[in-house]
Amino acid sequence: MNASPHSKPSAALAPSPTAAFFPSTSRVYTSKAATVVDDDEALDEIRRYESFSTVDWVVDNTRERNRLARERQAASAHFVSSSSNAHLGNADAAWGHIGFGRGGVPPRWWSRGPWGRRAWLVWGIVKSASSAFTDSGVIVLVGILIGLNMGVISLATEWASDLKQGYCSSGWWLNQKFCCWEMMDQAGPGGAPLPAAAKALATATVTVTASIGAAAAATDSAPILPATPAATPTAAIRAVAQEAYNLTIRAIPDHQLWSRSAQDVIQDGFGTGLRLLSRAEGAASGAGDLSETCTDWVRWSKWSFPAWIIYMLFAGLLSFICAHLVKSFAPYAAGSGISEIKCILAGFVINGYLGFWTLAIKSLTLPLAIASGLSVGKEGPAVHVACCIGNVVASFFRSFNRSQAKMRELLTASSAAGVAVAFGSPIGGVLFSLEEMAYNFPASTMWRSFLCALAATVTLSFMNPFRTGKLVLFQVSYDRDWHYFEIMFYILIGIFGGLYGAFVIKYNLQVQSFRRSYLVKHGVSEVVVLATLTAFVGYANKFLRIDMTESLEILFRECEGGGDYDNLCQSWAQWRMVNSLLLATVLRTALVIVSYGCKVPAGIFVPSMAIGATFGRMVGILVKALYNAFPHWSLFSACQPDVPCITPGTYAFLGAAAALAGVTRITVAVVVIMFELTGALTYILPTMIVVGITKGVADWFSRGGIAEQMIKFSGYPFLDKDDHNFGIPVADVMRVCPQVLFASGMKLSELEGKLADGSYKGFPLVLAKHDATLLGYVGKVELRYAIGKARRARALDGDTLCLFSVGPNALDRADGVESSAHGAQQQQPDLLSVASLPTTAAADRAVREDMLSRFSGATGAGSASGLGSTSATGVASQRRHESESLIGQLDVEDDRSSAPSYRSRVDAGDNMSSSSDDDAVVGNAGGGVDGESDLDKLELGGWIDPTPLIVQPGMPLETVMDMFKNLGPRVILVVEYGRLSGLVTVKDVLKRIAMQEKAEAAARTAAAAGLPMSGSANSFTGEGAGAGGGELEALLKEAYEWAQEKWALISPRIERISARRASASRGGAPGSQAGQARYSHLRESTEDRYDDSDAVAEDMPMHSTRQTSATKNTRSEHHQFVLGAQDDDDE
């Protein structure tokens, strides 16, 4: 239902919104209806939702349904008006009856004849059809842009990562892989070596080329004849030599084939052969290191120590540039973004978080953050970037701008596309958005997520950024089956994944708490220190030195036919590999804990997968070593002798799945993502076993993944999907003294004073100060809009009486006046006001008819929807006394996020402006307001929502929590016997959840320590929730304080040294050596004397502080005097 914004209780009638669409039936209200639409358009320009407020989904859905209903009415108006023949008499006047709505009149140059009208009708149909396909077109466009963006980010990341180790001499823009493309196969670095025949071919190329050169030495310009290779003795060598000859001929351009010197032939032939030899023997010499076989790739230094220093310098430089850009231009670009996007999809508004600058800076700095070597990933930030693209693109389309529900669907689809291109898993991306991101996931959202993920994946596939046909670098395929005896080892990997997730989440939150307390002003320095420390620690370990995606590709690979890397598949080096992998697991876990959450784009998905992969590969190597040592054990009876029994790469693959599931607590999406990475149906069951065990172990320690825990840590108003058992009524958590407005009348100055309070987004409306009967709810922005319009229409002062008329007898009850004449005068306008409500659904019609029946009664006391009447006088008297005591104690206690008014539910735009900008916005808004003709009164009743969501005080809190989850309101009013008792918001429920969790944690701690349970009774008060620190936070705090103390001791010496150097540089001119020597001697003696006095002052009692300060001031004055004397000597 829609309360008309222009219902006047005096003589004027409120226009019906249908008058704008049915002029033939409501011509009396045509001008008023145009004013209604003007108000709607003006309010569309106002940003409806304030930053860090919550979207009311009940409001938004109602407004969207009514908007669609008005469009259908406008489209059907043509068929209503075209039944008459009026347009035949006056063609120009008939344009108003065509029924395309406002703005439907064609331009002046359009033909006014019959064919012109038909063409205009066809054009309207085309526009309607195109608008129907606009949504899908926007989804596809967003998906294409996401794919392009991720392709560019992948290439930039690879190039910047390789820049720390060297550069390509043939092109500075090429990374190591593209620079040495000829030296490796399609598998990339560490790929499979060439077969033995190719090695023989390369050797023959070198030999035959040498023979050709010797034969051609006699004649410097001798032609190269095809008969030369035929001189080889045997058929096998002849075939090899023939192929070598063909390679040599192809290496020589056609125009130089008959005029080449012997030296040129020898160089070309030897070059081709040596390249083939290098490629054939690449695996034996550590194919992962292309610098030994690729001459185009130049390392910064051939020595380990200088290369290590340069590696750290590049890491610090890249991290500094990244952190500085984020801090200077887009602070919202820091972090992963998953937690905030979950809250945004649930209705929490963060203005600028999905803006253009965030998109540009995060896309630019994400490759820098990954290339710096920080233990962070790009998959989480890829979701944030994808949502930024969706938001920026949708801002150009009005259909998305004015509907928060459609914008939510688009952002959900964008997040699915972001995961799809990050992991090369379109179906996994859709399931990720369903399982992790979406707060509400209807069927239409599923289709749009699928379409967007498909468009993004196809675009990335066309780009082919790695030139291998892979969407991501660590895609791999397995063709071997697993054995049932391996399930015990899979269980071990699953347990590790659960322990890893619980461990990382617990200690990362402690690091975040320490970072918030001590490192807020040192974000850039922290990032540089972390990057340098990571490079310092990880350079010696090859699994930490290389990029994490490349590390995953190497660890996932099979040994047989998959290539080797640093002897990873060699049996003689298995124990060295075990040690290296274990060290990499431990060190990267520690680095992830301290790095995730720093002020750069930072994800945790791929770092967790890299940790799980190193642990899993280690387990696989140990199992394979056990099989090689005891192949005849009954445990290995299922193994076939001629087929490799154990594949360590599959263990790495399962370890990555376990770690990812442990830190995110996602199950189905992880299984599908890992399946799409391998394409192996045989490993779905092991993956499900591992992920299921990981989920159980991790949830035993704590519930919720890293994203949910970060939401709680940040204090965002987000209700998770878990069920809670409170066992209390809603009255125990409601706000009992909310700010209210009085329908009996308020002075304009008093009303504006309440509007100036930034703690509220709206106010409940009660009958009067002495009667707390609830009449409705009104939003702050609507009131400011109406007052601003009224000020432009006529003069208003602070004593103007503001009225909120809802029913025909409401004001009479409030004033104690029962005037039948006045009531009769008001009755007709109120009936028409109610009749003008749009009827877009059967429920709306039923409520409207109920209101009509209530208002039409001659003796009935009017009541707003949702209010009950008190029949017993005793109960009424008691409730009136309670309401007087309630309303008399109104005050402002804390921030309260309330819903916008009913007017905004139906007609307004999608965003609220900030409270600081509201006055300026209202000043420029258009539209009208009720009661403009009365100089003493200002009627604002048309802006009231007469049907807010209400509950009884005794309703269980669990039911109210389900209402918040399923309906999505911002505020629910608590009403008893028709009178306002309080209100409850999402924050109230979250406070209760936090108190309950804290109490349960305190109880577990007390039980583990053997303390009595009464010691944790105060936990239920909720005080200090989340304020406690952990052991890691305490350790970091002690280290920080120790560093501050040491710096306080060192910094004065550094300052003195700097001052001496500065004075030496000033006194270095000829003729000033004497004065400089005298100054230095005097200053050193003075500093020694005052240093001794400072040492004595440190041992003085507290009452000597003033004396110490005077001593220091004297010292400072003496330094100034000495410097001044030196300046005089210099002059």
From Swiss-Prot:
Residues 866-877, 1061-1078 have a biased composition (Low complexity). One of its GO terms (biological process) is intracellular iron ion homeostasis. Residues 1104-1113 have a biased composition (Polar residues). It is a multi-pass membrane protein. Residues 944-1000 form the CBS domain. It is found in: Membrane. Coiled coil: none annotated. Residues 815-835, 858-928, 1061-1131 are annotated as: Disordered. Keywords: Chloride, Chloride channel, Ion channel, Ion transport, Membrane, Transmembrane, Transmembrane helix, Transport. GO terms for molecular function: voltage-gated chloride channel activity. The chain crosses the membrane at residues 137-157, 206-226, 305-325, 341-361, 380-397, 414-434, 485-505, 518-538, 577-597, 603-623, 643-663, 680-702. The keyword Transport applies. The keyword Ligase does not apply. GO terms for cellular component: chloride channel complex; early endosome; endoplasmic reticulum; fungal-type vacuole; Golgi apparatus; plasma membrane. It holds the Pfam family Voltage_CLC. Voltage-gated chloride channel. Belongs to the chloride channel (TC 2.A.49) family. This is Probable chloride channel protein UM03490-D. The lineage of its organism: Eukaryota, Fungi, Dikarya, Basidiomycota, Ustilaginomycotina.
